């Protein structure tokens, strides 16, 4: 469906409102599937999809859906392994670009991990999951929060199964995390050990007397700890026990026996010794991590396609959740043959709008006794809501053609080919503006098809007399072609004389309140020319005025009421 003039701006504002509510960028792509269309079957299909989706999507899922993001499996080159293959397999293996490849066994010695298809090292096939299973495991591990969120949205699904498999590799990740922080762990243990040894020395000193105490203090001041520990073997045993205990704690978390602390005081591990230990552990962990990843990835691979589908489905559910929020208290409009209307429609661009009921074309029994007309002239008070009503009509018609619910208690519409909306341009006047506006109206009226044309005060850019003649003829042509037209005009009486087939409605300012402010009922009265605002403004000035000013205003007011 084609949107012309200010109808495009209304659509952009509706889209902007929706997009601002969508926090996940990937979910915004679903909006593109709901561009306004003139295909009746497509509109019905969209309505059915949204009816089902909005009914089933749960508000409590939002917390989990907002945690969803893409899980990206990056391609990486591994320098810690080499793949030994037959001459025939070299080209295929090199194309994978995952690690160094050779067919010469003499080139494999310096690598921690030796993979092979010809009987050396770890037996593999030439495929990514065998050569670099970490490429699958690491991204999944790093995105456990996404998997956990998906498991809440789709219990028992692919994410759930992958999380169960990842638990088998959890211990290795913990070891690797400890390895990264090994320097800090050892330094902390050093401090802890030295503090405990100092405490033991102090306590032990209190048990000594006489010559033993003198010898102890002399050796301690001289730093002759070897003599001290040799002389006092019980103390030595206690300190060795503390060191062994500290090493066991580190060994337990690393899963490998470690002897790193010197049997001396103060305990201090040289940095080069820590680095040597880290290199040794890294080598062992890489092999362990590879083997466990290889085993785990075989269980995970069958679920990856389903996982991808779950992520896309989660974006779709989030999109539906946003639409559900946006369209709360909306209604799906009924598709009819000849009419556009709504009961208690609410303008989405106005805060706390007054609900309004209106129609053009057939009313389908919703407005008994009201004249049905394809051409409607809307008259009445300035600032009474006439332009807002045109805006509301365009909102409802655009949303309806998107397949969306609309802001009303009840609504119906004819599937259109085009919507034209000519909003009043308050700062544009003169011959140029008149010519441009007239050309725009002629473009709207020409051609065939189902059209809705919304016009806001065409007469404001030319003389009222000329405007009445031009509009009358244009509206006759629109009537002959079966177009729907709602035009805001102060020329209701003049136009009604020229085109009796049109219905004239009015928005009335009811009067003045106790503070002399205008009271406006934004619900149009059908078949009634709206009472103009100028009369009420004159009345307000007459009631406020004094002396001669009041007398003049009262004389003007009498002219209105003759």
Curated annotation (Swiss-Prot):
SMART domains tied to this protein: MUTSac
Offer one example of a GO biological process linked to this entry. Answer: mismatch repair
Needed cofactors: Co(2+); Mn(2+)
Q: Which domain of life is it from?
A: Archaea
Provide the alphabetized UniProt keywords. Answer: ATP-binding, DNA-binding, Hydrolase, Nucleotide-binding
How does activity fare over a range of temperatures? Optimum temperature is 90 degrees Celsius for ATPase and DNA-binding activities.
Functional summary from the UniProt entry? Has ATPase and non-specific DNA-binding activities. May be involved in recombination and/or recombinational repair. Not involved in mismatch repair.
Please identify the protein, giving its name as recorded.
DNA-binding protein MutS2
State the organism of origin: Pyrococcus furiosus (strain ATCC 43587 / DSM 3638 / JCM 8422 / Vc1)
Supply the source organism's classification.
Archaea, Methanobacteriati, Methanobacteriota, Thermococci, Thermococcales
């Amino acid at each position: 469906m084609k949107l012309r003039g200010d109808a495009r701006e209304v659509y952009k504002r509706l889209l902007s409102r929706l997009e601002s509510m969508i926090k996940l960028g990937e979910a915004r792509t679903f909006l593109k599937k709901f561009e306004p269309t003139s295909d009746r079957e497509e509109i019905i299909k969209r309505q059915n999809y949204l009816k089902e989706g909005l009914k089933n999507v749960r508000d409590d899922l939002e917390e989990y859906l907002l945690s969803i993001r893409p899980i990206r499996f990056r391609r990486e080159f591994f320098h810690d392994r080499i793949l030994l293959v037959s001459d025939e397999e070299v080209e295929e293996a090199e194309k994978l670009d995952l690690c160094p490849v050779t067919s010469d066994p003499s080139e494999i010695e310096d690598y921690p991990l030796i993979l092979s298809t010809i009987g050396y090292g770890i037996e593999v096939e030439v495929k990514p999951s065998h050569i670099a299973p970490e490429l699958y495991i690491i991204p999944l591990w790093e995105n456990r929060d996404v998997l956990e969120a998906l498991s809440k949205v789709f219990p028992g699904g692919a994410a759930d199964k992958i999380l169960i498999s990842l638990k088998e590799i959890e211990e290795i990740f913990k070891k690797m995390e400890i390895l990264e922080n090994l320097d800090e762990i050892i330094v902390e243990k050093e401090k802890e050990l030295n503090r405990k040894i100092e405490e033991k020395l102090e306590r032990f000193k209190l048990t000594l007397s006489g010559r033993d105490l003198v010898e102890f203090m002399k050796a301690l001041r001289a730093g002759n700890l070897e003599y001290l520990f040799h002389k006092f073997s019980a103390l030595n045993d206690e300190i060795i026990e503390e060191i062994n205990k500290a090493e066991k704690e580190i060994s337990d978390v690393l899963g490998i026996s470690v002897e790193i602390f010197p049997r001396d005081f103060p305990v201090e591990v040289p940095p080069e010794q820590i680095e040597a230990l880290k290199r040794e552990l890294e080598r062992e962990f890489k092999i362990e991590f590879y083997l466990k990843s290889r085993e785990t990835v075989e269980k995970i691979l069958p679920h990856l396609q389903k996982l991808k589908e779950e992520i896309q489905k989660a974006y779709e559910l989030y999109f539906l959740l946003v639409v559900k929020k946006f369209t709360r208290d909306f209604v799906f409009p009924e598709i009819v043959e000849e009419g556009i209307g709504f009961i208690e429609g609410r303008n989405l661009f106005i805060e706390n709008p007054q609900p309004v009921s209106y129609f053009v074309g057939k009313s389908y029994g919703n407005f008994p006794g009201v004249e049905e007309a394809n051409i409607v002239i809307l008259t009445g008070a300035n600032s009474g809501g006439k332009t807002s009503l045109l805006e509301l009509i365009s909102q409802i018609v655009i949303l309806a053609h998107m397949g969306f619910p609309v802001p009303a208690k009840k609504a119906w519409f004819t599937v259109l080919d085009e919507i034209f909306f000519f909003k009043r341009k308050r700062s544009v006047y003169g011959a140029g503006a008149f010519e441009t506006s007239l050309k725009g109206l002629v473009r709207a009226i020409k051609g065939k098809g189902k059209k809705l044309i919304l016009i806001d005060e065409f007469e404001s850019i030319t003389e009222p007399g000329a405007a009445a003649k031009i509009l009358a003829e244009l509206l006759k042509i629109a009537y002959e072609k079966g177009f729907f037209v709602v035009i805001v005009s102060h020329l209701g009486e003049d136009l009604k004389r020229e085109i009796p087939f049109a219905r004239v409605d009015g928005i009335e300012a009811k009067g003045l309140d106790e503070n002399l402010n205008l009271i406006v009922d934004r619900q149009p009265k059908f078949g009634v020319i709206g009472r103009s605002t100028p009369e009420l403004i004159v009345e307000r000035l007459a009631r406020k005025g004094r002396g001669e000013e009041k007398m003049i205003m009262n004389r003007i007011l009498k002219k209105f009421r003759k």
